[in-house]
């Protein structure tokens, strides 16, 4: 009996050993195949001038592909994976930004003898048209109720936009000058408004060389000195208009060309004075509702006449407004690749962890969070939170380490949901066209692109697993998930060709 049992055990052991050898051989063969795919990609003529870094690992840590994984490359918007991830990890998915309404001075017979302050707390979606944000008229109506509840029927001072939540400049010094006037180059401020944009309607002139017709649309910034220098370009030249402005003077010049065959369209540019814009719009709202503001609107940067009447050192809070939760902000950040939101999360890390939202403090805070995540900062040299700076440098190895640490965190489900699916809504809508849904929908990735740069990093979920909102992801699924990063720099080939080749590589990796 015992001999027979031992004989069966030996047979079982031999079978198990044989299976393990087969599985090991298969796994090795797959890794070898993936490595060949990666080498083929690097040797493609499309990337003849490019630097390429690739790494892919399983959730258990097994390396599947590794090519130049330690080379540090410009990540472009792949930086948003880091800013949204560290914010979710450090601040929590339920974190909200708070804007408060306050006044100084005193109230007598319905008159506020002082100033009314809109004290910004870094809410990047105040006044945004996005459906995730509270509609501006609702915010203003609530603030109006707060003003009336405080017994204020008239304001002898000014309505002041207070953006001092932000220390230092709102833009990163290494951003390119040509980006600063664009909607995607809008800098952070303590009090933001309409995502720090201003919109114009643009239409071509009657002939090539004629002035472009351009008018402010929203918000109406009447205090700005706009210099419209754009001209009508040849057919097929598209929109090549750029706005050049700075936060030091309310002057903006729009230069470039707008194609003769283009129809009337809306163009979004950056607003360097969102604090004052918000104050003006709320002041106008109050006056429409019968609450006079004797000294108009002001801020701490553009219009400071009001400071003769008050110092804002001691104020009484009479109302507040909260942003959407961070989880939803992260979703919008990664799906739209929204630079302003990413920069805000980066600065919030500094504010909450060091007490300062300046760039240097935010960098120190982010490195501290990475240390808590046991990721470290080797393979990372950052300048901002959005990836707009070309001086950001990240290795594929660091990106995989970071994504692996996020998988082990308590906020992984929220983080994963924030990442777009190829072919779906967001910045990946043109990726993986024609790829079957059961393959395509397993990907949760973030793209990064600028001139000469194309990067993709994220997760490939196991086949047969359906991701459900709010459901915990089993460890077995995490172990079988592929974590990857593909980064290309200095590539002069066409965008569509690069995207097509990288799509094929990612699909092969997913198989």
List each language-model region with its residue ranges.
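A short glycine/serine-rich beta->alpha loop
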Residues: 68-73, 268, 386-389
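Short active-site loop at a secondary-structure junction
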Residues: 66-86, 90
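Small-residue-rich helix-loop
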Residues: 64-66, 336, 343-511
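Residue-level preference for non-acidic, small/hydrophobic
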Residues: 61, 80-87, 159, 191, ...
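Bacterial Sec-dependent N-terminal signal peptides
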Residues: 1-33
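Beta-lactamase-like hydrolase cores
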Residues: 30-60, 65-71, 145-151
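Short beta-strand scaffold segments in enzyme catalytic cores
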Residues: 54-56, 99-101, 457
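Conserved serine DD-peptidase/penicillin-binding transpeptidase domain
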Residues: 40-41, 90-377, 464-469, 478, ...
């Amino acid at each position: 009996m015992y001999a027979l049992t031992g004989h069966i055990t030996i047979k079982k052991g031999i079978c198990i050993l044989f299976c393990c050898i087969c599985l090991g051989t298969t796994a090795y063969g797959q890794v070898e195949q993936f490595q060949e795919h990666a080498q083929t990609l690097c040797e493609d003529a499309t990337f003849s001038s490019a630097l390429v870094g690739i790494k892919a690992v399983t959730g258990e840590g097994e390396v599947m592909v590794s090519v130049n994984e330690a080379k540090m490359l410009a990540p472009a918007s792949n930086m948003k994976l880091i800013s949204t991830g560290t914010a979710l990890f450090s601040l929590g998915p339920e974190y909200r930004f708070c804007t408060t309404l306050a006044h100084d001075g005193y109230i007598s017979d319905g008159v506020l003898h002082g100033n009314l302050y809109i004290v910004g707390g870094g809410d990047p979606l105040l006044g945004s048209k996005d459906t995730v944000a509270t509609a501006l008229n609702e915010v203003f109506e609530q603030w109006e109720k707060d003003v009336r509840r405080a017994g204020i029927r008239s304001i002898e001072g000014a309505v002041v936009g207070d953006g001092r939540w932000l220390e230092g400049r709102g833009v990163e010094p290494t951003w390119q000058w040509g980006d600063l006037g664009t909607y995607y180059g809008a800098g952070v401020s303590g009090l933001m408004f309409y995502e720090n944009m201003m919109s114009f309607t643009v239409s071509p002139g009657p002939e090539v060389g004629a002035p472009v017709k351009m008018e402010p649309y929203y918000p109406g910034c009447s205090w700005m000195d706009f210099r419209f220098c754009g001209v009508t370009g040849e057919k097929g030249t598209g929109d090549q208009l750029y706005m050049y402005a700075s936060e030091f003077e309310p002057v903006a010049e729009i230069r470039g060309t707008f194609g003769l065959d283009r129809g009337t369209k809306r163009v979004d540019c950056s607003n360097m004075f969102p604090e004052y814009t918000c104050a003006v719009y709320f002041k106008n709202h109050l006056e429409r509702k019968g609450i006079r503001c004797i000294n108009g609107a002001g801020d701490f940067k553009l219009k400071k006449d009001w400071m003769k009447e008050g110092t804002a050192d001691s104020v009484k809070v009479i109302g507040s407004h909260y942003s959407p939760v961070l989880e939803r902000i992260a979703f919008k950040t990664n799906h739209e690749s929204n630079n302003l939101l990413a920069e805000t999360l980066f600065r919030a890390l500094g504010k909450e962890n060091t007490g300062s939202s300046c760039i240097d403090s935010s960098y120190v805070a982010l490195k501290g969070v990475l240390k808590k995540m046991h990721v470290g900062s080797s393979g990372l040299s950052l300048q901002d939170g959005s990836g707009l700076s070309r001086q950001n440098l990240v290795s594929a190895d660091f990106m995989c380490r970071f994504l692996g640490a996020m998988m082990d965190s308590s906020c992984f489900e929220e983080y994963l949901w924030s990442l777009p699916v190829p072919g779906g809504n967001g910045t990946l809508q043109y990726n993986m066209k024609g790829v079957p849904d059961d393959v395509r929908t397993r990907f949760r990735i973030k793209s990064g692109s600028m001139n000469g740069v194309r990067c993709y990093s994220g997760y490939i979920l196991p086949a047969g697993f359906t991701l459900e909102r709010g459901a915990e992801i089993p460890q077995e699924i995490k172990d079988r998930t592929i974590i990857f990063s593909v980064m290309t720099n200095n590539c002069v080939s066409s965008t569509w060709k690069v995207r097509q080749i990288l799509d094929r590589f990612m699909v092969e990796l997913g198989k």
